[in-house]
Protein backbone atom coordinates (compact mmCIF):
# COMPACT_ATOMS: atom_id res chain seq x y z
CA UNK A 1 0.00 0.00 0.00
CA UNK A 2 3.04 2.27 0.33
CA UNK A 3 3.71 2.05 -3.40
CA UNK A 4 3.60 5.21 -5.50
CA UNK A 5 0.46 5.34 -7.65
CA UNK A 6 0.53 8.85 -9.13
CA UNK A 7 2.85 11.88 -9.34
CA UNK A 8 1.83 15.36 -10.47
CA UNK A 9 4.23 18.25 -11.07
CA UNK A 10 3.05 21.85 -11.39
CA UNK A 11 4.37 25.40 -11.61
CA UNK A 12 3.53 27.61 -8.62
CA UNK A 13 4.86 30.94 -7.27
CA UNK A 14 7.57 31.56 -4.70
CA UNK A 15 7.96 34.40 -2.21
CA UNK A 16 9.74 36.63 -4.74
CA UNK A 17 7.02 36.33 -7.38
CA UNK A 18 9.02 33.85 -9.45
CA UNK A 19 7.78 30.42 -10.54
CA UNK A 20 8.93 27.31 -8.74
CA UNK A 21 8.16 23.59 -8.84
CA UNK A 22 5.60 21.76 -6.73
CA UNK A 23 5.05 18.00 -6.72
CA UNK A 24 2.22 15.84 -5.39
CA UNK A 25 3.00 12.16 -4.76
CA UNK A 26 0.08 9.76 -4.22
CA UNK A 27 0.38 6.28 -2.73
CA UNK A 28 -1.87 3.27 -3.24
CA UNK A 29 -3.07 3.75 0.34
CA UNK A 30 -4.49 7.15 -0.60
CA UNK A 31 -1.78 9.10 1.26
CA UNK A 32 -0.55 12.19 -0.60
CA UNK A 33 2.61 14.20 0.02
CA UNK A 34 3.13 17.69 -1.41
CA UNK A 35 6.42 19.59 -1.54
CA UNK A 36 7.98 22.57 -3.30
CA UNK A 37 11.49 23.54 -4.33
CA UNK A 38 13.00 26.78 -2.96
CA UNK A 39 15.31 29.08 -4.93
CA UNK A 40 18.41 31.09 -4.00
CA UNK A 41 19.58 34.60 -4.97
CA UNK A 42 23.25 34.35 -3.99
CA UNK A 43 24.18 30.89 -5.24
CA UNK A 44 27.32 28.80 -5.17
CA UNK A 45 28.76 28.02 -8.60
CA UNK A 46 28.85 24.29 -7.81
CA UNK A 47 25.20 23.97 -6.81
CA UNK A 48 22.99 21.43 -8.57
CA UNK A 49 21.24 23.10 -11.49
CA UNK A 50 17.90 24.84 -11.02
CA UNK A 51 16.21 24.32 -14.39
CA UNK A 52 14.52 27.44 -15.80
CA UNK A 53 12.81 27.69 -19.18
CA UNK A 54 14.71 30.72 -20.50
CA UNK A 55 11.62 31.84 -22.46
CA UNK A 56 11.81 35.63 -22.09
CA UNK A 57 8.17 36.01 -23.16
CA UNK A 58 7.08 34.20 -19.99
CA UNK A 59 7.99 35.18 -16.41
CA UNK A 60 11.10 36.98 -17.73
CA UNK A 61 12.60 33.62 -18.66
CA UNK A 62 12.16 32.18 -15.16
CA UNK A 63 9.33 29.73 -15.91
CA UNK A 64 9.79 26.13 -14.80
CA UNK A 65 7.62 24.27 -17.31
CA UNK A 66 10.62 22.18 -18.45
CA UNK A 67 11.19 20.97 -14.89
CA UNK A 68 7.46 20.29 -14.47
CA UNK A 69 7.44 18.33 -17.74
CA UNK A 70 10.40 16.29 -16.46
CA UNK A 71 8.29 15.28 -13.45
CA UNK A 72 5.16 14.44 -15.40
CA UNK A 73 6.77 12.79 -18.44
CA UNK A 74 10.03 11.24 -17.19
CA UNK A 75 10.14 10.91 -13.40
CA UNK A 76 6.53 9.84 -12.75
CA UNK A 77 6.54 6.78 -15.06
CA UNK A 78 9.89 5.64 -13.61
CA UNK A 79 8.71 5.85 -9.99
CA UNK A 80 5.23 4.33 -10.25
CA UNK A 81 4.98 1.10 -8.25
CA UNK A 82 8.04 1.84 -6.10
CA UNK A 83 7.68 1.99 -2.32
CA UNK A 84 7.75 5.48 -0.81
CA UNK A 85 9.36 3.88 2.25
CA UNK A 86 12.54 3.23 0.24
CA UNK A 87 13.64 6.87 -0.03
CA UNK A 88 17.18 5.98 -1.06
CA UNK A 89 16.03 3.82 -3.96
CA UNK A 90 13.49 6.41 -5.16
CA UNK A 91 16.09 9.19 -5.09
CA UNK A 92 18.66 7.00 -6.85
CA UNK A 93 16.21 6.16 -9.65
CA UNK A 94 15.75 9.91 -10.30
CA UNK A 95 19.48 10.63 -10.10
CA UNK A 96 20.32 7.78 -12.50
CA UNK A 97 17.53 8.75 -14.88
CA UNK A 98 18.83 12.32 -14.98
CA UNK A 99 22.34 10.98 -15.53
CA UNK A 100 24.25 14.24 -15.05
CA UNK A 101 26.62 15.31 -12.29
CA UNK A 102 24.60 18.42 -11.39
CA UNK A 103 21.05 17.29 -12.28
CA UNK A 104 20.94 19.58 -15.29
CA UNK A 105 18.69 17.33 -17.39
CA UNK A 106 15.61 17.38 -15.14
CA UNK A 107 16.70 20.15 -12.78
CA UNK A 108 17.38 19.83 -9.06
CA UNK A 109 14.12 21.72 -8.56
CA UNK A 110 12.16 18.87 -10.20
CA UNK A 111 14.01 16.03 -8.45
CA UNK A 112 13.92 17.72 -5.03
CA UNK A 113 10.19 18.50 -5.11
CA UNK A 114 9.43 14.83 -5.84
CA UNK A 115 11.99 13.58 -3.31
CA UNK A 116 10.47 15.61 -0.47
CA UNK A 117 6.90 14.81 -1.52
CA UNK A 118 7.75 11.08 -1.39
CA UNK A 119 9.01 11.48 2.20
CA UNK A 120 5.87 13.38 3.20
CA UNK A 121 3.61 10.74 1.63
CA UNK A 122 5.53 7.98 3.42
CA UNK A 123 5.17 9.74 6.79
CA UNK A 124 1.42 10.11 6.24
CA UNK A 125 1.14 6.47 5.23
CA UNK A 126 2.98 5.42 8.40
CA UNK A 127 0.77 7.85 10.37
CA UNK A 128 3.80 9.49 11.98
CA UNK A 129 5.08 13.09 11.88
CA UNK A 130 7.53 13.99 9.12
CA UNK A 131 10.34 14.71 11.61
CA UNK A 132 9.98 11.17 12.99
CA UNK A 133 10.10 9.65 9.50
CA UNK A 134 13.21 11.73 8.70
CA UNK A 135 14.93 10.56 11.89
CA UNK A 136 14.22 6.95 10.87
CA UNK A 137 15.59 7.55 7.36
CA UNK A 138 18.63 9.16 8.97
CA UNK A 139 19.35 6.13 11.15
CA UNK A 140 18.84 8.23 14.30
CA UNK A 141 15.29 7.16 15.20
CA UNK A 142 13.97 8.95 18.27
CA UNK A 143 16.91 11.36 18.55
CA UNK A 144 15.46 14.87 18.31
CA UNK A 145 16.41 18.41 19.27
CA UNK A 146 14.84 21.81 18.76
CA UNK A 147 17.13 24.09 16.74
CA UNK A 148 18.59 27.41 17.84
CA UNK A 149 17.21 29.90 15.30
CA UNK A 150 19.57 32.26 13.46
CA UNK A 151 17.20 35.14 12.81
CA UNK A 152 18.13 37.41 9.95
CA UNK A 153 16.97 40.85 11.10
CA UNK A 154 19.12 43.11 8.90
CA UNK A 155 19.48 42.20 5.21
CA UNK A 156 22.18 43.50 2.87
CA UNK A 157 24.05 42.23 -0.17
CA UNK A 158 22.03 40.30 -2.75
CA UNK A 159 19.01 40.10 -0.43
CA UNK A 160 18.33 43.84 -0.29
CA UNK A 161 18.52 47.01 -2.32
CA UNK A 162 20.77 48.97 0.03
CA UNK A 163 24.43 49.85 0.54
CA UNK A 164 25.24 47.21 3.19
CA UNK A 165 27.79 44.68 1.89
CA UNK A 166 27.35 41.83 4.37
CA UNK A 167 24.25 39.89 3.37
CA UNK A 168 22.80 38.85 6.72
CA UNK A 169 23.05 40.10 10.28
CA UNK A 170 21.43 37.58 12.60
CA UNK A 171 20.54 37.18 16.26
CA UNK A 172 20.66 33.82 18.06
CA UNK A 173 18.57 33.55 21.27
CA UNK A 174 21.08 31.18 22.86
CA UNK A 175 19.98 31.90 26.43
CA UNK A 176 16.38 30.78 25.94
CA UNK A 177 15.19 27.72 27.90
CA UNK A 178 13.24 26.31 24.95
CA UNK A 179 12.37 27.04 21.32
CA UNK A 180 9.11 28.79 22.14
CA UNK A 181 10.89 31.34 24.32
CA UNK A 182 13.69 31.71 21.75
CA UNK A 183 11.10 32.65 19.15
CA UNK A 184 9.50 35.16 21.51
CA UNK A 185 12.87 36.77 22.20
CA UNK A 186 13.57 37.05 18.49
CA UNK A 187 10.17 38.59 17.79
CA UNK A 188 10.60 41.16 20.55
CA UNK A 189 14.07 42.09 19.26
CA UNK A 190 12.67 42.40 15.72
CA UNK A 191 10.00 44.87 16.87
CA UNK A 192 12.55 46.71 19.02
CA UNK A 193 14.86 47.06 16.00
CA UNK A 194 12.03 48.58 13.97
CA UNK A 195 11.66 51.29 16.63
CA UNK A 196 15.44 51.91 16.73
CA UNK A 197 15.60 52.31 12.94
CA UNK A 198 12.49 54.54 12.85
CA UNK A 199 13.95 56.80 15.54
CA UNK A 200 17.06 57.24 13.39
CA UNK A 201 14.94 58.11 10.35
CA UNK A 202 16.02 54.90 8.61
CA UNK A 203 13.94 52.68 6.33
CA UNK A 204 11.97 49.85 7.89
CA UNK A 205 11.23 48.20 4.54
CA UNK A 206 12.19 44.53 4.54
CA UNK A 207 14.34 42.37 2.25
CA UNK A 208 13.71 38.94 0.74
CA UNK A 209 14.03 37.14 4.07
CA UNK A 210 11.98 39.55 6.16
CA UNK A 211 14.85 41.45 7.76
CA UNK A 212 15.07 45.22 7.61
CA UNK A 213 17.12 46.68 4.78
CA UNK A 214 18.19 50.21 5.79
CA UNK A 215 21.03 52.20 4.27
CA UNK A 216 23.73 52.23 6.94
CA UNK A 217 27.19 53.80 6.97
CA UNK A 218 28.99 50.52 7.63
CA UNK A 219 28.67 46.89 8.62
CA UNK A 220 29.61 47.92 12.15
CA UNK A 221 26.68 50.34 12.26
CA UNK A 222 24.38 47.40 11.52
CA UNK A 223 25.86 45.52 14.48
CA UNK A 224 25.45 48.56 16.74
CA UNK A 225 21.77 49.11 15.93
CA UNK A 226 21.08 45.41 16.53
CA UNK A 227 22.82 45.54 19.92
CA UNK A 228 20.78 48.62 20.82
CA UNK A 229 17.59 46.78 19.81
CA UNK A 230 18.53 43.72 21.89
CA UNK A 231 19.21 45.85 24.96
CA UNK A 232 16.05 47.93 24.46
CA UNK A 233 14.09 44.67 24.35
CA UNK A 234 15.46 43.86 27.81
CA UNK A 235 18.02 41.23 26.88
CA UNK A 236 21.73 40.96 27.61
CA UNK A 237 24.20 40.55 24.76
CA UNK A 238 26.37 37.45 24.90
CA UNK A 239 24.27 35.95 27.69
CA UNK A 240 20.76 35.89 26.24
CA UNK A 241 21.58 36.71 22.63
CA UNK A 242 24.59 36.32 20.34
CA UNK A 243 25.23 37.53 16.80
CA UNK A 244 25.89 35.72 13.53
CA UNK A 245 26.89 36.97 10.07
CA UNK A 246 26.45 35.65 6.57
CA UNK A 247 29.00 37.60 4.55
CA UNK A 248 28.16 35.88 1.22
CA UNK A 249 31.68 36.98 0.29
CA UNK A 250 31.56 35.47 -3.19
CA UNK A 251 29.17 38.29 -4.11
CA UNK A 252 31.84 40.98 -3.54
CA UNK A 253 34.97 38.97 -4.42
CA UNK A 254 36.40 40.52 -7.58
CA UNK A 255 39.78 39.68 -9.16
CA UNK A 256 41.12 38.15 -5.97
CA UNK A 257 40.02 41.06 -3.76
CA UNK A 258 37.14 41.61 -1.33
CA UNK A 259 35.54 44.88 -2.43
CA UNK A 260 33.24 46.36 0.22
CA UNK A 261 31.69 49.04 -1.96
CA UNK A 262 29.33 50.23 0.78
CA UNK A 263 32.34 51.11 2.94
CA UNK A 264 34.77 52.03 0.18
CA UNK A 265 37.29 49.42 1.38
CA UNK A 266 39.18 46.72 -0.53
CA UNK A 267 40.87 43.75 1.19
CA UNK A 268 42.98 40.81 0.13
CA UNK A 269 42.28 37.36 1.53
CA UNK A 270 44.47 37.72 4.61
CA UNK A 271 43.36 41.22 5.56
CA UNK A 272 39.67 40.40 5.08
CA UNK A 273 40.17 37.45 7.43
CA UNK A 274 41.72 39.90 9.92
CA UNK A 275 38.73 42.24 9.45
CA UNK A 276 36.33 39.41 10.33
CA UNK A 277 38.47 38.29 13.28
CA UNK A 278 38.46 41.87 14.60
CA UNK A 279 34.66 42.08 14.31
CA UNK A 280 34.30 38.77 16.19
CA UNK A 281 36.62 40.03 18.93
CA UNK A 282 34.82 43.38 19.26
CA UNK A 283 31.23 42.10 19.14
CA UNK A 284 29.59 38.86 20.39
CA UNK A 285 29.70 37.26 16.93
CA UNK A 286 29.93 33.49 17.36
CA UNK A 287 29.07 32.34 13.83
CA UNK A 288 30.28 33.57 10.42
CA UNK A 289 28.99 32.06 7.19
CA UNK A 290 30.83 32.32 3.86
CA UNK A 291 33.42 34.64 5.35
CA UNK A 292 35.56 34.11 2.25
CA UNK A 293 34.93 33.31 -1.41
CA UNK A 294 33.99 29.75 -2.39
CA UNK A 295 37.24 29.41 -4.39
CA UNK A 296 39.53 30.99 -1.76
CA UNK A 297 40.49 27.75 0.00
CA UNK A 298 43.80 29.14 1.27
CA UNK A 299 41.99 32.11 2.79
CA UNK A 300 39.44 29.78 4.39
CA UNK A 301 42.20 27.62 5.89
CA UNK A 302 43.88 30.74 7.28
CA UNK A 303 40.61 32.05 8.77
CA UNK A 304 39.88 28.64 10.32
CA UNK A 305 43.32 28.64 11.96
CA UNK A 306 42.77 32.23 13.19
CA UNK A 307 39.36 31.94 14.82
CA UNK A 308 37.96 28.45 14.15
CA UNK A 309 38.49 27.41 17.79
CA UNK A 310 36.06 30.06 19.06
CA UNK A 311 33.83 31.03 16.11
CA UNK A 312 31.59 28.76 14.04
CA UNK A 313 32.74 29.09 10.42
CA UNK A 314 29.94 27.94 8.14
CA UNK A 315 30.50 26.88 4.54
CA UNK A 316 27.53 27.58 2.27
CA UNK A 317 28.69 28.54 -1.24
CA UNK A 318 31.92 26.80 -0.20
CA UNK A 319 30.36 23.34 0.29
CA UNK A 320 26.93 23.58 -1.46
CA UNK A 321 25.60 20.62 0.62
CA UNK A 322 27.90 18.36 -1.42
CA UNK A 323 29.68 15.49 0.36
CA UNK A 324 32.61 15.43 -2.07
CA UNK A 325 33.40 19.10 -1.43
CA UNK A 326 32.66 18.81 2.30
CA UNK A 327 35.15 15.92 2.59
CA UNK A 328 37.84 18.16 1.09
CA UNK A 329 37.05 20.79 3.74
CA UNK A 330 37.17 18.25 6.56
CA UNK A 331 40.47 16.79 5.31
CA UNK A 332 42.10 20.22 4.87
CA UNK A 333 40.99 21.99 8.06
CA UNK A 334 38.71 24.36 6.17
CA UNK A 335 35.65 25.67 8.09
CA UNK A 336 34.01 23.79 10.97
CA UNK A 337 30.36 23.85 9.95
CA UNK A 338 28.20 23.34 6.85
CA UNK A 339 25.03 25.10 5.78
CA UNK A 340 22.46 22.60 4.58
CA UNK A 341 20.19 23.59 1.70
CA UNK A 342 18.09 20.86 0.07
CA UNK A 343 18.14 22.41 -3.37
CA UNK A 344 21.93 22.82 -3.55
CA UNK A 345 22.20 19.04 -3.91
CA UNK A 346 18.67 18.15 -5.01
CA UNK A 347 17.43 15.15 -3.01
CA UNK A 348 16.58 14.23 0.58
CA UNK A 349 18.94 11.22 0.59
CA UNK A 350 21.97 13.31 -0.44
CA UNK A 351 21.01 16.01 2.08
CA UNK A 352 20.96 13.47 4.92
CA UNK A 353 24.34 12.10 3.76
CA UNK A 354 25.86 15.60 3.99
CA UNK A 355 24.45 16.15 7.50
CA UNK A 356 25.78 12.77 8.69
CA UNK A 357 29.23 13.36 7.20
CA UNK A 358 29.45 16.77 8.88
CA UNK A 359 28.32 15.51 12.28
CA UNK A 360 30.62 12.47 12.14
CA UNK A 361 33.58 14.80 11.51
CA UNK A 362 32.71 17.07 14.44
CA UNK A 363 31.31 19.79 12.19
CA UNK A 364 27.94 21.36 12.92
CA UNK A 365 25.16 21.35 10.32
CA UNK A 366 22.94 24.44 10.04
CA UNK A 367 19.63 23.76 8.27
CA UNK A 368 18.69 26.63 5.95
CA UNK A 369 15.96 28.14 3.83
CA UNK A 370 16.61 30.02 0.57
CA UNK A 371 15.76 33.64 -0.19
CA UNK A 372 13.04 32.43 -2.57
CA UNK A 373 10.71 30.32 -0.42
CA UNK A 374 7.13 29.03 -0.24
CA UNK A 375 4.81 28.01 2.57
CA UNK A 376 6.50 24.56 2.58
CA UNK A 377 7.96 24.03 6.07
CA UNK A 378 9.89 20.78 5.50
CA UNK A 379 13.16 22.28 6.77
CA UNK A 380 11.61 22.57 10.25
CA UNK A 381 11.07 18.80 10.32
CA UNK A 382 14.54 18.22 8.86
CA UNK A 383 16.17 20.27 11.64
CA UNK A 384 14.35 18.37 14.39
CA UNK A 385 14.55 14.94 12.75
CA UNK A 386 18.32 15.10 12.30
CA UNK A 387 18.92 16.83 15.68
CA UNK A 388 20.96 19.38 13.72
CA UNK A 389 20.67 21.96 16.50
CA UNK A 390 20.51 25.12 14.35
CA UNK A 391 18.18 26.58 11.72
CA UNK A 392 18.30 29.63 9.47
CA UNK A 393 14.88 30.60 8.23
CA UNK A 394 14.78 34.35 8.09
CA UNK A 395 13.21 37.07 10.14
CA UNK A 396 9.99 37.37 12.10
CA UNK A 397 7.84 38.61 9.27
CA UNK A 398 6.76 37.31 5.83
CA UNK A 399 4.61 34.22 6.07
CA UNK A 400 7.07 32.18 3.96
CA UNK A 401 9.55 32.54 6.86
CA UNK A 402 7.11 32.39 9.77
CA UNK A 403 5.62 29.13 8.38
CA UNK A 404 8.82 27.34 9.44
CA UNK A 405 8.81 28.88 12.93
CA UNK A 406 5.17 27.94 13.41
CA UNK A 407 5.89 24.35 12.38
CA UNK A 408 8.71 24.23 14.94
CA UNK A 409 6.28 25.45 17.63
CA UNK A 410 3.89 22.62 16.72
CA UNK A 411 6.70 20.06 16.80
CA UNK A 412 7.95 21.28 20.20
CA UNK A 413 4.42 20.99 21.59
CA UNK A 414 4.05 17.46 20.20
CA UNK A 415 7.43 16.29 21.53
CA UNK A 416 6.84 17.61 25.04
CA UNK A 417 9.75 16.71 27.33
CA UNK A 418 11.66 15.16 24.41
CA UNK A 419 11.97 18.62 22.81
CA UNK A 420 15.42 19.59 24.10
CA UNK A 421 16.84 23.04 23.23
CA UNK A 422 20.62 23.12 23.42
CA UNK A 423 21.15 26.87 23.17
CA UNK A 424 24.74 28.05 22.97
CA UNK A 425 26.31 24.60 23.11
CA UNK A 426 24.81 23.78 19.69
CA UNK A 427 27.15 26.31 18.06
CA UNK A 428 30.64 25.13 17.13
CA UNK A 429 33.39 26.62 19.26
CA UNK A 430 31.09 27.44 22.20
UniProtKB/Swiss-Prot annotation:
Primary location group: cytoplasm
Record note on cofactor: Binds a second Mg(2+) ion via substrate during catalysis.
GO terms for MF: magnesium ion binding; phosphopyruvate hydratase activity
Subcellular compartments: Cytoplasm; Secreted; Cell surface
Gene3D superfamilies associated with the record: Enolase-like C-terminal domain, Enolase-like, N-terminal domain
Pfam family, one: Enolase_C
Binding residues annotated for Mg(2+), in chain numbering: 246, 289, 316
GO cellular component terms, A-Z: cell surface; extracellular region; phosphopyruvate hydratase complex
Reactions catalysed according to its record: (2R)-2-phosphoglycerate = phosphoenolpyruvate + H2O
Quaternary data: Component of the RNA degradosome, a multiprotein complex involved in RNA processing and mRNA degradation.
General function of this protein: Catalyzes the reversible conversion of 2-phosphoglycerate (2-PG) into phosphoenolpyruvate (PEP). It is essential for the degradation of carbohydrates via glycolysis.
Family: Belongs to the enolase family.
Protein name (record): Enolase
Organism of origin: Pseudoalteromonas atlantica (strain T6c / ATCC BAA-1087)
Amino acid sequence: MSNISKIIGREIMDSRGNPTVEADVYLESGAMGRATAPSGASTGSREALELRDGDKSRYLGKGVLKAVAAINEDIAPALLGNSAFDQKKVDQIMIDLDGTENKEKFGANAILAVSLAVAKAAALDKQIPLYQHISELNGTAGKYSMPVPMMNIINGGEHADNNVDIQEFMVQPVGAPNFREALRMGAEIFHSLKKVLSAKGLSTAVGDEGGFAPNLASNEEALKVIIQAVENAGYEMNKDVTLALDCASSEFYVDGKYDLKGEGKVFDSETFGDYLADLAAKYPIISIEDGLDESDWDGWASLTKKIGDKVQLVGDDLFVTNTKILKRGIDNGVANSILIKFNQIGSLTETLEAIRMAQDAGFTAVISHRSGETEDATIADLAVGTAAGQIKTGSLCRSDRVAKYNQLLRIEEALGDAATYGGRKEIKGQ
